């Protein structure tokens, strides 16, 4: 049955539920306005009184003597180890811009290397010899940029960022440090005392990511064509990654480098092929192209020590007297290989391999080793060197 009300003529007029609720709300609002108008001062006083009581209660709870939850303290910048931490990585699209004829600005991010923890103090995976000199043609620092920079004479870095991204658990112990040295020919720091004296330095626990901004001056310098005797004249400086205090040598993170560099004055393409030669006495006589590999030998062992990570094709030959035995050390994995032994005279080889971290070494063991020649270049696994 519909709800009704009477009018002045005592007639019945139907009223819906919605209309009745609207009438009730209007009446309630009118009554509330009247109450507030007549008792406004009392209401305000009550609100203020309640607010003061709440403030005193909160202040009392925050007192040092009654604080129930305490955290391990630290100086400014300290962080607490979470249960888990990760970083989601996305691809980087290189950007090319140019405002001046004969120049181009390249902005990109590249993968540098995997970081393995160490118990003692170690820099750049234990590889010495100014590994990460800041020059666009340095193939040990950049894997993508040299193919472009090899077509230009000069460069100027606009910005450089070194970024450590962890991949280990938060229970991992040790430290990871990144530094910048303005002199690209300074020796690597020998211990933590020397490391701490760098003005551009960033350290972190292996489970926490960290970034190092490198100061740039936008001065035009020459790209490295491997014929410069004093590298500090052509390099912006050098980078380094140090580890220490770990419980083992497991992988703890990755290093990425982001940069913006302007290349000037196009030139004929410079070589991207690394060539290293030893004479009959084992003395280096040729070193051209990127420094992917350090070549040394004894009368019984030919050693190729990698100075960069990635996939490479290595070809070479060396004088020896007997058949050779291949040896692999560190993070190097052979994808394909061909070895030809000319017993009594020499041996030659072709190797396609992937290097994930440093130090990584390939050796050939035999007898009567004298001179040697090797060539190395970046490649893919599809560059199969197996003899069919």
From Swiss-Prot:
Residues 264-388 are annotated as: P domain, projecting. GO terms for molecular function: RNA binding; structural molecule activity. Keywords: Capsid protein, RNA-binding, T=3 icosahedral capsid protein, Virion. The keyword tRNA processing does not apply. Its main location: virion. It is found in: Virion. Belongs to the icosahedral plant coat protein family. Homomultimer. It holds the Pfam family Viral_coat. Residues 56-61 are annotated as: Involved in encapsidation. Residues 103-263 are annotated as: S domain, virion shell. Residues 1-102 are annotated as: R domain, interaction with RNA. This is Capsid protein. Capsid protein self-assembles to form an icosahedral capsid with a T=3 symmetry, about 32-35 nm in diameter, and consisting of 180 capsid proteins. One of its GO terms (cellular component) is T=3 icosahedral viral capsid.
